[in-house]
Amino acid sequence: MKKLLLLLCIALLCPGCGGKKDNNENVVLPSESPIINEEIKPEETSTPEPSIEPSILPKEDTSTLSNKKIGWYFMKGKDHNQPTFGKDLSVPADKYDAIYLKSNEDKTIYLTFDEGYENGYTAQILDTLKEKNVKAVFFVTGPYLEKEKELVKRMVDEGHEVGNHTINHKSMPTLSDEEVEKEVLDLDKKFHDEYGKSMKYLRPPMGEFSERTLSITKSLGYTNVFWSFAY
């Protein structure tokens, strides 16, 4: 009994022992970090606004990198074979972990759609994808995100990936390092504020890029996604 009373006294004298973690939601763009909750007392706490970090990977010194503008293109393969890509692409996209072609061993097709503006087809595309139970990636711009909220909400609700096509759809090699980051992260923040999700795939506007812009966007945690077929 004396031991029990002694333990109770120690517990009362040390109410802060063990500490308490705040219920924080730390968001590192473009990928979301899990929320870790550890409650000690049943009290209400306010959740701080998620923070936006401009970079999640060490930056490369871009002053040593080429900023020659490269326009992405492909050449159709014969007999339904996979396409080939321009020999003058002086910077191989895969050097910076960009995606443009996957192995055809499993005969998988990845569908991506650029949503720079709405021409009346997206609702039909979403209907067809839903009917066939197929998921796709839709790359949206800032104006599209603002004007086509119903369609973007459908993309999110129906399980599609919404990718970053930058906020103003500018040729990235013409921008400074800071402007490139702003074009990408401003759109990411708007999307996160509206839907609670972060973007992780980027399609450079007009398919124009340079070694410098690939490096910058990779440092932001993005995967650049090009294409091997267009319609």
State what each model feature region is.
Residues 1-22:
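Sec-dependent N-terminal signal peptides of Gram-positive bacterial secreted proteins and lipoproteins
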Residues 17-111, 118-124, 131:
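N-terminal pre-catalytic segment of deacetylase/amide-hydrolase enzymes
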Residues 96-97, 126, 149-153, 184-188, ...:
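Generic structural signal for well-ordered alpha-helices
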Residues 106-109, 132-136, 158-160, 197-200, ...:
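Short, well-ordered coil/turn segments that N-cap beta-strands
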Residues 114, 129, 162-165, 202, ...:
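Conserved, mostly hydrophobic/aromatic
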Residues 116-120, 140-148, 171-175, 203-209:
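Acidic-and-aromatic substrate-binding clefts and catalytic sites of carbohydrate-active enzymes
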Residues 125-133, 145-165, 217-219:
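Acidic (Asp/Glu)-rich catalytic clusters
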Residues 170-231:
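Catalytic domains of cell-wall/extracellular-matrix polysaccharide-remodeling enzymes
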